[in-house]
Amino acid sequence: MPRKGPAPKHPVVVDPVYGSPLVTALVNKVLLSGKKSVAERIVYGALEGAKNKTGNDPVVTLKRALDNVKPTLEVRSRRVGGATYQVPVEVRAGRSTTLALRWIVGYSRGRREKTMTERLMNELIDASNGLGASVKRREDTHKMAESNKAFAHYRW
């Protein structure tokens, strides 16, 4: 534990276009090599494309996608007497949002569409409809936690 205590939480910057801190977080997850304007162009293009394709408010689509991808349980490794157990633990709210954004961006990078804007747009639409690789990742995480429920008493 550091002597100075935990690092202070930074104030959440609200997105100038949509007025949502979730959009800012998504831009920061898409960001590569410090090229923020490129990341903003990708995210705004994806949100506009989602708006045109679904006809819904893009921030609502993003929130629905996040709700469908956010994990409630995950497994953590815990070493007990020479054996390593996968112990299911509940996920904090901030971490679940971060994981959901990370999974959405990661799986959109692996998609087959031509541009990152299209990939992110389609992954967001799929996730908001309960489909896609990022939703499957959440289901796999929950399944892993469910199958290791016997080790829940090792929780810390």
From Swiss-Prot:
User: PROSITE patterns in the record, alphabetically?
Assistant: RIBOSOMAL_S7
The organism's superkingdom is given as: Bacteria
User: Which cysteine-cysteine pairs are annotated as disulfide bonds in the entry?
Assistant: none
Q: Name one GO cellular component term.
A: small ribosomal subunit
- Report the record's Gene Ontology biological process terms: translation
The UniProt GO MF terms for this protein read: rRNA binding; structural constituent of ribosome; tRNA binding
What keywords are annotated for this sequence in UniProt?
A: Ribonucleoprotein, Ribosomal protein, RNA-binding, rRNA-binding, tRNA-binding
Q: Name the Gene3D superfamilies for this protein.
A: Ribosomal protein S7 domain (1.10.455.10)
Please explain the role this protein plays, according to its UniProt record: One of the primary rRNA binding proteins, it binds directly to 16S rRNA where it nucleates assembly of the head domain of the 30S subunit. Is located at the subunit interface close to the decoding center, probably blocks exit of the E-site tRNA.
Q: How does it assemble?
A: Part of the 30S ribosomal subunit. Contacts proteins S9 and S11.
Name the protein family.
Answer: Belongs to the universal ribosomal protein uS7 family.
NCBIfam families registered for this protein in UniProt: rpsG_bact (TIGR01029)
Q: What is this protein called?
A: Small ribosomal subunit protein uS7
